[in-house]
């Protein structure tokens, strides 16, 4: 085994071990004893519907036209999780028909999530919380990972590992830290730096290309964060984008979450993936040019980098704008409907944050 390959293995294994240590330590610090750990104990069970036993409907008063307002579907289901696994459960689905898009009616064979809450007349011990979507989502993820492994091979495996670590850093470190009232700015920056370093070390290893891409990525993300801090006062940002933000603010009245800091976290976490993509693309292209033409002057190499960057910028700008529009399309439709002109739409805080 040559030295380069041995070094690559050492860096690879060290990155995985250090990532596990970091994630575990950060989780212990982030979890604390705050809001995140204070949850109502709700018993939920995954089950498969065996048969429909009864259906009932209630009619609203004459003021609303005497229309059917509620439908109750009673059914039996076999539990597939929890302490009651294997047992037959008696449950009910409550459908509010006054809404334009009520929940689909439960059918035999459906996989559902039930919540334990006996009703007054004793006809059901559980009620339908939602339809279970875990199985199709797992199949979709498995198919996605399979494609990555087929086309990426060793790089594909590295990509999957880095993706798992990235999700863990966000869901077991950053989110608990925010909910427990810790410094959102510090945790956001630390999380983004960790994601950048970990991903590049696993994908590329410890070399000049990794260093250049890492510096470019961290620098770009910090610039994005700095712009948010500078502009927030100029645009009179409140941090309240809709009712969900108010609910988040009131989770812990004694120590409310800083909504402006949440926006800061949104921006840099959302930017780190795109910036890392651009940084690695430029660094990889320049390394290939340098390997093929080692005698190329640094000035010419810099010009090549700028040319590549301009080409990437032309498509990446569209990518980012369309990604944000796509994720907020429903909100955009409502804004267009209830706004009198384009200026009023652009002046909204939701658009400013996006």
Which residue stretches match the model-derived regions?
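A short beta-strand signature
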Residues: 71-81
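Transmembrane alpha-helical segments that form the functional core of multipass membrane systems
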Residues: 142-149, 154-249, 257-270, 328
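Alpha-helical transmembrane segments and their helix-start/interface "positive-inside/aromatic belt" motifs
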Residues: 5-13, 208-221, 312-320
């Amino acid at each position: 085994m040559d030295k380069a390959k041995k070094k690559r293995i050492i860096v690879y294994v060290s990155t995985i071990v250090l990532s596990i240590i970091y994630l575990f330590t950060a989780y212990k610090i982030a979890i604390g004893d705050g809001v995140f750990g204070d949850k109502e104990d709700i018993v939920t069970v995954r089950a498969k519907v065996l048969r429909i036993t009864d259906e009932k409907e209630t009619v609203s008063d004459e003021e609303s036209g005497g229309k059917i307002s509620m439908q109750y579907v009673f059914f039996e289901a076999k539990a597939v999780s929890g302490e009651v696994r294997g047992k037959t459960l008696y449950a009910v689905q409550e459908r509010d028909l006054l809404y334009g898009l009520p929940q689909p009616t439960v059918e035999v064979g459906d996989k559902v999530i039930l919540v334990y809450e006996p009703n007054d007349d004793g006809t059901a011990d559980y009620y339908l919380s939602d339809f279970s979507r875990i199985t199709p989502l797992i199949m979709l993820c498995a198919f996605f990972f399979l494609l990555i492994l087929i086309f990426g091979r060793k790089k594909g495996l590295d990509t999957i590992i880095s993706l798992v670590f990235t999700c863990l850093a966000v869901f077991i470190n950053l989110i608990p830290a925010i909910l427990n009232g810790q410094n959102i700015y510090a945790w956001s920056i630390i999380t983004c730096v960790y994601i950048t370093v970990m991903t590049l070390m696993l994908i590329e290893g410890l070399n000049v290309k990794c260093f250049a891409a890492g510096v470019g990525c961290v620098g770009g993300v910090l610039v994005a964060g700095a712009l948010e801090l500078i502009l927030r006062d100029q645009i009179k940002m409140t941090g309240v984008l809709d009712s969900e933000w108010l609910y988040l603010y009131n989770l812990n009245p004694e120590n409310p979450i800083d909504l402006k800091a949440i926006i800061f976290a949104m921006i840099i976490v959302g930017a780190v993936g795109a910036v890392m993509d651009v940084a690695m693309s430029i660094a990889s292209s320049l390394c290939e040019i340098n390997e093929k033409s080692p005698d190329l002057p640094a000035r010419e190499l810099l010009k090549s980098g700028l040319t590549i960057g301009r080409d990437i910028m032309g498509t990446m700008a569209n990518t980012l704008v369309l990604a944000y529009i796509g994720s907020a399309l429903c909100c955009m439709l409502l804004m267009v409907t209830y706004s009198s002109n384009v200026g009023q739409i652009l002046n909204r805080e939701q658009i400013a944050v996006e």
